[in-house]
């Protein structure tokens, strides 16, 4: 049990917010690739406790290690929509981050839902309190209000540890000693998110070999995925609200993946799954560069007996020279944008017009943009969007 009232033994869903704030909110992400045809998700529907059309070919009963969720009634009453903003304080927000946050906020508010703000600061480069404070100030300036939080991942390590222990106790993990250089040197094919597909070099090491290697360097921890011939479990299918039907064979298109790095930092896939469930998130809106992470997260959700939210990935914003906007390159960062536009209404109105959310670039508040927002519009503009300075 952590300070938020979250328990991760056999389940993670007893969440009680330790504080409720009515400041302002957002979650940055700005990415996008090209994916698939539009889905038919209805606005306002939330997945019930037992996801139905998400894992079409995954036999939950044979691999779920927390069966309470798998046994939940499929006809449970719809739950309130809960969206989230999950920025990483690795630098100043840029325009792509603002776009991601805006879409998440508009989608949730258009369904009468609430927003959770979570600061994803597990990585050392994100442990900069001054950047987290700046990020929160920027979200407040934009007028995107949140209802719970901010919560910080560095305060939630016990939850991730408990989830990892469940996987370990079920025999689903193993120590991996492969270095990043070794993985890239193997010239292995890459997963959809650019990481090398792991071919299982450390999967079947003997106890003696594990002990020998552990004396030399700390291992990472990998999660086993179903074997390629395990057709009942290997293929993950889901429907993305923007890009439609998605399908991934874990063994051949992903491989066993990290749940904890060798430096002890919990992997993004595990932490985000635990947090989304604990916070009751029913809708995840984020950049399309994270579309490839979704099958791994759904696999983890089912192993841990957690609900699967709706997923909606959005286009990436690109610079005129074809580059993806990035914090590192300080592309259209919010400091510059605040100076240039002067007011949040001017910035949001211009962004909404550039991305097709609104019919023009008339200055508008976030609240005024709710009536213009539609996932049909996002689907119609699902290719990368090139933006130019005002």
Which functions belong to the PLM regions below?
Residues 11, 18, 22-26, 39, ...:
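Low-complexity, intrinsically disordered segments with a bias for serine/threonine
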Residues 59-191, 288-289, 293-306, 364:
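N-terminal Rossmann-like or analogous alpha/beta NTP/dinucleotide-binding catalytic cores
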Residues 181-326, 333-338, 387-390:
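Active-site cores that bind ATP or allylic diphosphates and position pyrophosphate for catalysis
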Residues 17-19, 28, 35, 43, ...:
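Cationic, low-complexity basic patches in intrinsically disordered or flexible, solvent-exposed regions
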Residues 7, 13, 24-26, 32, ...:
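Short hydrophobic targeting helices and cationic amphipathic motifs
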Residues 3, 13, 21, 35-38, ...:
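Short, low-complexity intrinsically disordered segments enriched in A/P/G/S/L with frequent Arg
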Residues 47-91, 110, 115, 211-212, ...:
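Non-catalytic terminal extensions that flank enzyme cores
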